[in-house]
């Protein structure tokens, strides 16, 4: 993974064409970037005719540049009455412009009717952070997925089936890595049969490389004074891929059951409804967000580590995606009540502080995402009298999770049939439909797709053998307004360290936490845990320690709940494996990859978000909806694998620890 992204500079050549001093080349012909986009890329791929009447159409681009190809394609889609239902545009860019740089170039480009589209793009434009960034337009009908990083790094990380390719890197003589055989093979891995390709270059080695990768390539009339360009079609004469790329799903009925109406389930419900699905939402409680998601206030921020671990990457991607998703809800008239106060994460000791600073130096992320904040600045700017400095996340903050759930269900509207006070006792698959059963065996709902978003209760409904869900108890502590006032001041931002504290609410009260312990005994508040939370508070605000010591833990109230976690703290998201079938073929699958494992058709998990439900729910819901529809995934392949529900099964198979079961296991009846 490319960790440090160096943004491009918005420089113009003598004739006014955007120019890159890094590659000593222009971004497009002097005769105009939009005209080039229409002739070379739209025309060269037979668009818009090629997407007519399609459910979805996927374009992959190498070299986003200033985004003129995307804007021209988006405009062509909007103008076409025969347009595809959903347009996915996936573009790889190693040196993205900043938002300000993009705005300067677009102002110079004379975009005319495209200016409103440019404004929307600029509003959602991400920071220069490595990984995938999914931007949504036209109420989700047009999706731009930016893959920020080196092309040879990012291509293998894309999970999608492409219908068309735009090859728009700088000239092969200036940027050879964009035109390598490795890249051509990477394109072929993603291409659906018959996928088209176009590029402005007519270099012979490009056509030969494409041909070797399975494309039929030939010359076509060029643009802007160039006699020729290259067009191609993917038509391999032999099987050259272990796994074919995903195809657009063909569902006879777009109806899904979602079990669980917390952050995970409501997010999945909204994402499916946005794609035209009808959703039956089942929950054992009397409304949404009644269990672990019922907090009246919870914080969200990214995780940073020098090695940019799976946890760090997933948290960064989830944090950014959640903010965009919630912004879209707000813009559509469904307020979520986000408080962007910022989050200060201090180290618990000097060693952790040093590790935080080392991570910043290694990653060199934009300060708009994370930077160092000294204790002096924390005190002066935010009233946070912390003992040491820490990581400042300016886009972090807090929100009430139930408000998120209510906004998502309101957005889903009539597409969702929510059944509360409705306990699911078992699930089974009969024919092509999953059924959710009541305690008396009656069918509560039936649909071709079922999503388990019910935390540790999922163990009851599946064999559970390789989900390995664990319950971890957590207790929060509330301070009454008078108690918070007696401390003589309170930070106006979220502070995390050995524990965490949230800004005071509208009534003047405050919240802090949280314990993290094995789930044992009755689920009731314990004074000794409130006392431990007070100790955590004193460690973060040591100058208030004497006042904090005056608070009697026995007088405190709060909230106690159970987190669902896995062995490595990463969630379980995606298609659930068919354990019985896999174990019956254990010897044959010992050297398998995740994509080789048999899956239970139509059964998905959105589980084990632990204490990061706010961070992960929106992104993981988009992942599940994309898998169901056969769309490009919003996560890199290795990240999707890292949270795959079948990962523990795969590990058992590889180590020879998997044994064939005596039965299909409790919970899932796959009869029929």
Curated annotation (Swiss-Prot):
Region feature (FAD-dependent cmnm(5)s(2)U34 oxidoreductase): 259-672
This protein's superkingdom?
Bacteria
Gene Ontology cellular component annotations, sorted alphabetically: cytoplasm
| NCBIfam families in alphabetical order | MnmC_Cterm, PRK01747.1-2, PRK01747.1-4, tRNA_MNMC2
Q: Name one GO biological process term.
A: tRNA wobble base modification
EC code = 2.1.1.61, 1.5.-.-
The alphabetical list of record keywords is:
Cytoplasm, FAD, Flavoprotein, Methyltransferase, Multifunctional enzyme, Oxidoreductase, S-adenosyl-L-methionine, Transferase, tRNA processing
Task: Return the protein name.
Answer: tRNA 5-methylaminomethyl-2-thiouridine biosynthesis bifunctional protein MnmC
| Region of interest (tRNA (mnm(5)s(2)U34)-methyltransferase), residue spans | 1-235
Q: Which terms in the Gene Ontology molecular function aspect does this entry carry? A: flavin adenine dinucleotide binding; oxidoreductase activity, acting on the CH-NH group of donors; tRNA (5-methylaminomethyl-2-thiouridylate)(34)-methyltransferase activity
Record lineage: Bacteria, Pseudomonadati, Pseudomonadota, Betaproteobacteria, Burkholderiales
Question: Catalytic activity, per the record?
Answer: 5-aminomethyl-2-thiouridine(34) in tRNA + S-adenosyl-L-methionine = 5-methylaminomethyl-2-thiouridine(34) in tRNA + S-adenosyl-L-homocysteine + H(+)
Q: Where's it found, cell-wise?
A: Cytoplasm
The scientific name of the source species is: Cupriavidus metallidurans (strain ATCC 43123 / DSM 2839 / NBRC 102507 / CH34) (Ralstonia metallidurans)
Job of this protein: Catalyzes the last two steps in the biosynthesis of 5-methylaminomethyl-2-thiouridine (mnm(5)s(2)U) at the wobble position (U34) in tRNA. Catalyzes the FAD-dependent demodification of cmnm(5)s(2)U34 to nm(5)s(2)U34, followed by the transfer of a methyl group from S-adenosyl-L-methionine to nm(5)s(2)U34, to form mnm(5)s(2)U34.
């Amino acid at each position: 993974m490319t960790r440090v992204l160096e943004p491009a500079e918005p420089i113009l050549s003598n004739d006014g064409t955007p120019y890159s001093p890094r590659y000593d080349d222009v971004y497009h012909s002097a005769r105009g970037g939009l005209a080039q986009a229409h002739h070379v890329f739209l025309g060269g791929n037979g668009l818009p005719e090629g997407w007519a009447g399609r459910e979805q159409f996927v374009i992959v681009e190498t070299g986003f540049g200033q985004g003129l190809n995307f804007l021209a394609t988006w405009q062509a889609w909007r103008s076409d009455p025969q347009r595809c239902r959903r347009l996915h545009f996936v573009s790889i860019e190693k040196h993205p412009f900043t938002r300000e740089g993009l705005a300067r170039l677009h102002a110079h480009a004379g975009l005319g009717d495209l200016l409103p589209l440019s404004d929307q793009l600029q509003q959602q434009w991400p920071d220069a952070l490595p990984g995938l960034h999914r931007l949504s337009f036209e109420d989700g009908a047009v999706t731009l997925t930016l893959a920020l990083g080196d092309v040879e790094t990012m291509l293998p990380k894309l999970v999608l089936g492409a219908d068309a390719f735009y090859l728009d890197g700088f000239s092969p003589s200036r940027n050879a890595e964009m035109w390598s055989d490795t890249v051509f093979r990477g394109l072929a891995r993603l291409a659906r049969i018959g996928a088209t390709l176009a590029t402005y270059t007519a270099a012979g080695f490009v056509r030969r490389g494409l041909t070797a990768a399975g494309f039929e390539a030939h010359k076509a009339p060029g643009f802007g004074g160039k006699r020729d360009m290259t067009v191609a079609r993917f038509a391999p004469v032999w099987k050259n891929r272990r796994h074919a790329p995903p195809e657009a799903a063909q569902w006879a009925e777009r109806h899904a059951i979602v079990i669980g109406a917390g952050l995970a389930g409501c997010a999945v419900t909204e994402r499916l409804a946005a794609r035209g699905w009808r959703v039956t939402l089942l929950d054992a409680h009397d409304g949404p967000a009644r269990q672990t998601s019922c907090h009246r206030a919870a914080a969200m921020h990214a995780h940073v580590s020098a090695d940019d671990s799976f946890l760090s990457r997933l948290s960064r991607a989830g944090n950014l995606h959640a903010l965009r998703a919630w912004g879209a809800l707000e813009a559509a008239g469904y307020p979520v009540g986000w408080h962007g106060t910022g989050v200060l994460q201090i180290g618990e000791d000097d060693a952790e502080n040093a590790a935080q600073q080392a991570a910043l130096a290694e990653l060199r992320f934009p300060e708009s995402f994370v930077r160092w904040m000294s204790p002096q600045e924390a005190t002066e700017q935010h009233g946070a009298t912390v003992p040491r400095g820490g990581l400042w996340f300016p886009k972090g903050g807090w929100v009430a999770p139930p408000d998120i759930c209510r906004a998502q269900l309101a957005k889903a509207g009539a597409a969702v049939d929510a059944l509360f006070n409705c306990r699911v006792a078992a699930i089974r698959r009969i024919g092509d439909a999953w059924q959710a059963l009541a305690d008396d065996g009656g069918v509560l709902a039936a649909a071709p797709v079922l999503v388990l978003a019910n935390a540790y209760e999922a163990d009851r409904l599946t064999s559970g053998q390789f989900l390995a869900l664990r319950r971890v108890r957590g207790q929060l502590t509330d301070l009454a307004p008078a108690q918070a006032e007696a401390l003589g001041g309170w930070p106006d931002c979220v502070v995390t360290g050995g524990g965490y504290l949230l800004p005071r609410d509208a009534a003047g009260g405050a919240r802090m936490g949280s314990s993290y312990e094995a789930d044992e005994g009755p689920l009731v508040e314990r004074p000794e845990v409130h006392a431990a939370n007070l100790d955590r508070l004193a460690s973060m605000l040591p100058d208030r320690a004497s006042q904090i010591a005056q608070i009697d833990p026995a007088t405190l109230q709060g909230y106690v709940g159970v987190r669902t976690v896995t062995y490595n703290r990463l969630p379980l998201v995606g298609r659930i494996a068919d354990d019985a079938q896999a174990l019956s073929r254990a010897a044959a699958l010992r050297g398998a990859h995740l994509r080789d494992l048999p899956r239970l058709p139509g059964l998905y998990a959105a589980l084990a978000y632990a204490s990061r439900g706010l961070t992960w729910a929106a992104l993981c819901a988009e992942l599940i909806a994309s898998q169901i529809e056969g769309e490009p995934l919003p996560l890199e392949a290795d990240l999707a694998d890292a949270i795959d529900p079948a990962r523990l099964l795969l590990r058992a198979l590889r180590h020879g620890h998997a044994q064939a079961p005596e039965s299909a296991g409790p919970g899932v009846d796959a009869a029929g």
